[in-house]
């Protein structure tokens, strides 16, 4: 009986050959993919926080408004309304604003507006009681108010005065809002953060803070009322690299503020709104493209004057929503938890 031996063209041989070719092609494609993919891992999702400092700002609503230096917490009605509306806008986009309040805000008789913000889920952090300078070298340089009324310090040494100013803000928040502060932001931003100021960091750790926001990176500015050219904008965007979270040697986490702040743009630069929005957009696009952390720093007491239609905040929400696969709105507590 003649047996049928498979020939080179038989189905069995063809299938074996095709299986071998398919396997080799798959292995080759995988190797090529790995080779091409080396070093091109997609960046992490960008984390975009909107932070608003609740204080009054020198030079707003008018350039000659300087009395706020002595009453930083005496918020006017416009500032309160802007804060409430901004919180609603961001919540509608699925985000939260991280507020930082100076303690003197809690001396005002009616803070129902701030309670409503807290009840809507927006965190509020400690911004010291009197908007003091934590890097001051002597006690009289802590704040304008103490230069005018030094007896308020009761002869305290520098670091005791700093500790008390932070501590009584914690107490005020507990008493008036029933909450603990959601982190700490220094009044003013420093190009080196608190790297050279271990004592204030130690005070903050002692008071229970495990993250702070104190660094604002150096970047180019324009002359007053001068439109920022491409070189200035590129310099501001480049400064984002210096505004990423890091830890100090003592373990304290720093979450820097991102450029450009509203005070830098509108007080120092005296920019118009469109220049500011264009620069903000460039910073956000870089943040989203590279998966960076972005901490939008602004003050309702400034924004209600220069941006009454909330264009900056709406721009942030719009870009985060449009690029939802690459970016998300968040707050500094969540950034800290992921750092």
Show which residues each predicted segment covers.
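N-terminal secretory signal peptides and thylakoid transit peptides that target proteins
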Residues: 3, 8-31
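Active-site beta->alpha N-cap acidic-glycine motif
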Residues: 43-123, 131-133, 180, 185-190, ...
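Acidic-and-aromatic substrate-binding clefts and catalytic sites of carbohydrate-active enzymes
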Residues: 75-80, 100-110, 132-137, 159-162, ...
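CE4/NodB-like, metal-dependent polysaccharide N-deacetylase domain
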Residues: 84-96, 147-192, 209, 255, ...
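C-terminal domain-boundary segment and adjacent tail
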Residues: 93, 211-216, 274-339
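Substrate-binding cleft of extracellular glycoside hydrolase catalytic domains
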Residues: 120-166
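Active-site-adjacent pocket scaffolds in enzyme catalytic domains
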Residues: 143-151, 186-287
């Amino acid at each position: 009986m003649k047996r049928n031996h498979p020939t080179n063209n038989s189905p069995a041989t063809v299938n074996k050959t095709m299986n071998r070719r398919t396997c080799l092609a798959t292995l080759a494609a995988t190797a090529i993919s790995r080779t091409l993919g080396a070093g091109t891992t997609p960046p992490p999702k960008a984390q975009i926080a909107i932070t608003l400092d609740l204080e009054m700002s020198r030079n707003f609503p008018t350039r000659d408004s300087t009395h706020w230096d002595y009453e930083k917490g005496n918020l006017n009605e416009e500032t309160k309304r802007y804060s409430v509306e901004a919180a609603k806008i961001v919540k509608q986009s699925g985000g939260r604003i991280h507020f930082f309040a100076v303690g003197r805000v809690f001396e005002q008789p009616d803070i129902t507006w701030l309670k409503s913000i807290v009840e809507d889920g927006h965190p509020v952090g400690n911004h010291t009681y009197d908007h003091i300078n934590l890097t001051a070298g002597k006690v009289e340089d802590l704040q304008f108010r103490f230069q005018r009324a030094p007896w308020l310090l009761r002869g305290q040494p520098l670091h005791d005065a700093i500790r008390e100013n932070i501590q009584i803000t914690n107490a005020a928040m507990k008493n008036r809002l029933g909450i603990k502060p959601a982190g700490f932001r220094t009044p003013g931003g420093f190009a080196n953060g608190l790297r050279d100021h271990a004592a204030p960091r130690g005070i903050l750790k002692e008071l229970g803070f495990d993250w702070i926001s104190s660094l604002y990176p150096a970047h180019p500015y324009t002359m007053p009322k001068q439109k920022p050219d491409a070189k200035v904008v590129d310099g501001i965007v480049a400064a984002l690299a210096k505004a990423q979270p890091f830890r100090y040697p003592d373990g304290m986490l720093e979450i820097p503020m991102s450029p450009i702040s509203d005070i830098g743009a509108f007080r120092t630069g005296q920019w118009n709104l469109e220049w500011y929005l264009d620069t903000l957009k460039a910073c956000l696009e870089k943040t989203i493209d590279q998966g960076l952390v972005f901490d939008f720093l602004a003050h309702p007491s400034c924004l209600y004057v220069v941006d009454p239609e909330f264009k900056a905040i709406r721009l942030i929400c719009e870009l985060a929503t449009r690029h939802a696969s690459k970016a998300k709105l968040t707050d500094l507590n969540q950034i800290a938890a992921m750092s």
